[in-house]
From Swiss-Prot:
Autophosphorylated. One of its GO terms (molecular function) is protein serine kinase activity. The gene is arnS. This is Serine/threonine-protein kinase ArnS. It comes from Sulfolobus acidocaldarius (strain ATCC 33909 / DSM 639 / JCM 8929 / NBRC 15157 / NCIMB 11770). Gene3D superfamilies: Phosphorylase Kinase, domain 1, Transferase(Phosphotransferase) domain 1. The keyword Zinc does not apply. Plays an essential role in the controlled expression of archaellum components during starvation-induced motility. May inhibit arnR transcription and promote ArnR translation. Induction: Induced during starvation conditions. Belongs to the protein kinase superfamily. Ser/Thr protein kinase family. Autophosphorylation is stimulated by Mn(2+).
Amino acid sequence: MLMSFILLISTSMILISVFSYVLIALIVLGIVLSLISLLSPRVSYVSSVYLIGLTVYLNPGFSLTQSLINTVPILGEINMLSGLLKTPVTSIISSLFSLALLNLGIKGYEIYLSKHADIVKLDSIIFSQHGLPKQANWNIVVNSEVKLLKSNEKLILSNTPEAKYELCPTLVDHKYYVPNKVTGLAFEGEVIRINYSPVDGVPYEKFRNCFTVFEVEGLPPDTSFVIEINGASLKLKDRKFAKLSLEPLYWKVNEIRISREDEEEIYEPDIKEGLTFRGGTVKINFRRKVIRYKTAKIPSIENWDPGIWVGQEVYGYRVIEVIGLGGNGYVMKVEKNGLLYAMKVLSVNKFTNSLEHFDNLLKESENLEKLSKDPRLVSIYGSFVDKNNIQSALAGDYTSYYKYPPAIIMEFMEGGTLFDLISRVDLVQSKYWQYIVKLVIKEIAKALTFLHKRGYVHLDVKPQNIFLKEKINGEPEVVYKILSSTPGIIKLGDLGSAVRVGEKITQATPAYSPPEQIEAVITGKGAQPSMDNYALGVTLYKLLTMKNLDYVNYLDKAFDEYIKGDPSIAMKYINMAKMSMVNFKPKLPHNTLPELANVVQGTLVVDPKRRLTSYDIVKILEG
């Protein structure tokens, strides 16, 4: 009995320390009634009624619907229980517990009695979830702000008079769990319990604001399509599907090709990419287009005629004409959506390392596109390389090469190539020609410096790959003035031949390649910037003399022998070319500008380490 009295007195002192003096008398009366209930259990009824009334009076959040239902009854119920049991122990426990709950009420708390036993401050709102797997997270939008929470985590909002909330399903292990509420309004002092339950299917109809809906039209039945959403690719057949996401969705879809015997169906989306937000609808309409292939016999890749593509569509580009032929491919003028482009189709050769070259191109295509943004390089807009089609072509299926050739889409250069300018006798024989040549070589040297600093070797520098952005007509003086006053008019093209420094070389143009480049094709040695510097020197020599180098014949024979499959004889010709270079002294026109002569002599040397760098060439020509 004494211990009970001490406990009650201690509790009362704690309560008195936080109450005002006005309330002391009321509290003391409650304690007295509790003590009397220890001696006479019947007094428990009186004590219960008193404590209930006191709690209701002191609870600042009292309302008939909340306090009577949630807060008040516990005091009376426990105290009444002690009276019914008629035991002093239950009276002590009930009195202490009643006073503790009374203290919480006075401090501004509401007591919610249930299996969850929540106690919430009157100026707070609590959100909790039940029903999700332990590993799952959940989210709730409160006053337009998304809150991300762990499975067992509650959301407690303090000093919030009211909260407008919205709930969405949660996807766990490919299964949707839906909440029992969609939207609502909560007020301070409330506990909002959200119950999740699993459902079959995608519940986007009920929770429309939580999903982005994609609707696809125009495709044949059972035709799959691939859509990329936030970097993840999905292969689908459904014409209507929904994506659950809290964040914006960036989506992208490509055209679909269906091949027939002598034609190909192309289904092109009216919108290829976009950014959407949840609650939105994206409609993608595919338009059908049929390409009918020529029924003429398709030539073998060894005797390929690029003219077979003229008038046809390749990768959605209409081929207008063939504008260039080379040892490693064909260049065609193409059109798409009213704009002109150049398409280079790479040749496939059974006797060279074609697949390895295409592997490198596929791997480096994105980097080369970025590099081509330099104003002195012809821009690359895209590349199409499918190793399976190349293998089929090498195995004799030439239709694969006809329909899906390895191709690079490039900026179309209206002015043609530097090689075209050589045909103008009046220009070449004029006093302005050397200055035009100096200007061109300096710009290409700057382009090579840019590539070399970024770890790439071009490997195919020659007049045919030096382009003019605009057509230039007029007298030699006019041509020189236009070239010298128009930035970006002179560009180095065909970046598709470029590889990283040190990587294997699979191709070469003997007339412009140094001996060690052809040797590297045979032996597998890596590419070096000095190969480009030599090729630029040969280009300069060609522009000044209109002649090929004396020892080029050896390099041509070396490459021919390699193609025939006899590398040992090829190496003999390469060594003969190197010996000729040791004693080679370039014969230039007597009036050649000294700086141009220095570049020729400094680049056409047999030892790659002694050659001028592209940066050296720029300095010489700018000095």
